[in-house]
Amino acid sequence: MHIFSKLDAFEQERSARLAHPKLSQYPTPFKINVGKLNAGVWPSSVPDLAVMEIRYGMSPNETVETAKAEFEAFIEQICSEDPWLSEHRPELEWLGTCWHPISVDENEELIQLVNQNMRLVRKRETEITGIA
Protein backbone atom coordinates (compact mmCIF):
# COMPACT_ATOMS: atom_id res chain seq x y z
CA MET A 1 0.00 0.00 0.00
CA HIS A 2 3.04 2.23 0.18
CA ILE A 3 2.79 2.86 -3.57
CA PHE A 4 -0.98 3.41 -3.39
CA SER A 5 -0.57 6.11 -0.73
CA LYS A 6 1.77 8.16 -2.96
CA LEU A 7 -0.33 8.15 -6.13
CA ASP A 8 -2.44 11.22 -5.26
CA ALA A 9 0.57 13.49 -4.76
CA PHE A 10 2.14 12.22 -7.99
CA GLU A 11 -1.14 12.82 -9.85
CA GLN A 12 -1.43 16.39 -8.51
CA GLU A 13 2.18 17.22 -9.35
CA ARG A 14 1.78 15.90 -12.92
CA SER A 15 -1.49 17.75 -13.45
CA ALA A 16 0.09 21.05 -12.37
CA ARG A 17 3.34 20.58 -14.29
CA LEU A 18 1.79 19.28 -17.53
CA ALA A 19 -1.19 21.66 -17.59
CA HIS A 20 -2.85 22.27 -20.95
CA PRO A 21 -5.00 25.37 -21.62
CA LYS A 22 -7.85 23.39 -23.21
CA LEU A 23 -8.12 21.19 -20.11
CA SER A 24 -8.19 23.94 -17.48
CA GLN A 25 -11.81 23.12 -16.56
CA TYR A 26 -10.62 19.86 -14.96
CA PRO A 27 -9.05 20.09 -11.48
CA THR A 28 -7.05 16.94 -12.22
CA PRO A 29 -6.98 16.39 -15.99
CA PHE A 30 -4.46 13.54 -15.94
CA LYS A 31 -6.09 11.14 -13.51
CA ILE A 32 -4.26 8.22 -11.98
CA ASN A 33 -7.11 5.95 -11.03
CA VAL A 34 -6.76 2.59 -9.32
CA GLY A 35 -9.67 0.90 -11.07
CA LYS A 36 -9.02 -2.59 -9.72
CA LEU A 37 -7.27 -3.70 -6.55
CA ASN A 38 -7.03 -7.38 -5.68
CA ALA A 39 -5.24 -8.55 -2.55
CA GLY A 40 -5.57 -11.41 -0.11
CA VAL A 41 -7.96 -14.32 0.08
CA TRP A 42 -9.62 -13.75 3.45
CA PRO A 43 -10.59 -10.55 5.33
CA SER A 44 -8.54 -11.37 8.43
CA SER A 45 -5.36 -12.45 6.63
CA VAL A 46 -2.42 -10.31 5.59
CA PRO A 47 -2.16 -10.51 1.79
CA ASP A 48 1.03 -11.90 0.32
CA LEU A 49 0.22 -10.39 -3.07
CA ALA A 50 -1.54 -7.26 -4.31
CA VAL A 51 -2.43 -6.43 -7.89
CA MET A 52 -3.40 -2.88 -8.86
CA GLU A 53 -4.76 -2.02 -12.28
CA ILE A 54 -4.38 1.69 -12.89
CA ARG A 55 -5.66 4.16 -15.46
CA TYR A 56 -2.73 6.51 -16.06
CA GLY A 57 -3.81 9.78 -17.67
CA MET A 58 -1.41 11.48 -20.04
CA SER A 59 -1.04 15.10 -21.15
CA PRO A 60 -0.94 16.33 -24.75
CA ASN A 61 2.34 17.93 -23.62
CA GLU A 62 4.09 14.53 -23.40
CA THR A 63 4.55 11.37 -25.42
CA VAL A 64 3.38 7.94 -24.33
CA GLU A 65 7.01 6.91 -23.99
CA THR A 66 7.95 9.81 -21.70
CA ALA A 67 4.78 9.35 -19.63
CA LYS A 68 5.51 5.66 -19.13
CA ALA A 69 9.15 6.38 -18.28
CA GLU A 70 8.05 8.94 -15.69
CA PHE A 71 5.69 6.45 -14.03
CA GLU A 72 8.39 3.78 -14.01
CA ALA A 73 10.83 6.27 -12.41
CA PHE A 74 8.15 7.16 -9.83
CA ILE A 75 7.80 3.47 -8.87
CA GLU A 76 11.59 3.06 -8.81
CA GLN A 77 11.97 6.07 -6.49
CA ILE A 78 9.43 4.62 -4.03
CA CYS A 79 11.21 1.27 -4.09
CA SER A 80 14.61 2.85 -3.48
CA GLU A 81 13.26 4.63 -0.36
CA ASP A 82 11.63 1.55 1.17
CA PRO A 83 13.76 -1.35 2.48
CA TRP A 84 11.09 -3.99 1.86
CA LEU A 85 10.16 -2.73 -1.61
CA SER A 86 13.82 -2.44 -2.59
CA GLU A 87 14.10 -6.20 -2.05
CA HIS A 88 10.62 -7.05 -3.40
CA ARG A 89 10.25 -4.83 -6.43
CA PRO A 90 6.79 -4.73 -7.97
CA GLU A 91 6.26 -5.97 -11.50
CA LEU A 92 5.04 -3.22 -13.79
CA GLU A 93 3.12 -4.28 -16.87
CA TRP A 94 1.39 -2.00 -19.39
CA LEU A 95 -1.91 -3.63 -20.32
CA GLY A 96 -4.82 -2.93 -22.62
CA THR A 97 -5.68 0.12 -24.61
CA CYS A 98 -3.35 3.09 -24.66
CA TRP A 99 -5.03 6.34 -25.65
CA HIS A 100 -2.28 8.51 -27.06
CA PRO A 101 -2.51 12.11 -25.86
CA ILE A 102 -3.22 14.59 -28.62
CA SER A 103 -3.94 18.27 -29.07
CA VAL A 104 -5.45 19.62 -32.28
CA ASP A 105 -4.97 23.24 -33.31
CA GLU A 106 -8.34 24.96 -33.09
CA ASN A 107 -7.61 26.66 -36.42
CA GLU A 108 -7.69 23.30 -38.22
CA GLU A 109 -10.34 23.21 -40.94
CA LEU A 110 -12.33 20.38 -39.34
CA ILE A 111 -12.45 22.11 -35.96
CA GLN A 112 -13.59 25.36 -37.56
CA LEU A 113 -16.27 23.55 -39.60
CA VAL A 114 -17.68 21.82 -36.51
CA ASN A 115 -17.54 25.08 -34.57
CA GLN A 116 -19.34 26.97 -37.35
CA ASN A 117 -22.09 24.34 -37.55
CA MET A 118 -22.51 24.29 -33.78
CA ARG A 119 -23.07 28.06 -33.88
CA LEU A 120 -25.69 27.62 -36.61
CA VAL A 121 -27.54 24.90 -34.69
CA ARG A 122 -27.25 26.32 -31.17
CA LYS A 123 -27.54 30.00 -32.14
CA ARG A 124 -24.71 31.01 -29.84
CA GLU A 125 -20.95 31.04 -29.60
CA THR A 126 -19.25 27.78 -28.75
CA GLU A 127 -16.25 27.16 -26.56
CA ILE A 128 -13.53 24.84 -27.79
CA THR A 129 -12.23 22.71 -24.93
CA GLY A 130 -10.54 19.39 -24.45
CA ILE A 131 -11.56 16.14 -22.81
CA ALA A 132 -9.55 14.34 -20.19
Regions found by a protein language model. Name each.
Residues 1-83:
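Midchain, well-structured core segments that form catalytic/ion-binding scaffolds
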Residues 1-36, 88-132:
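An extended, acidic, His-containing surface patch that forms the Zn2+-binding/catalytic region
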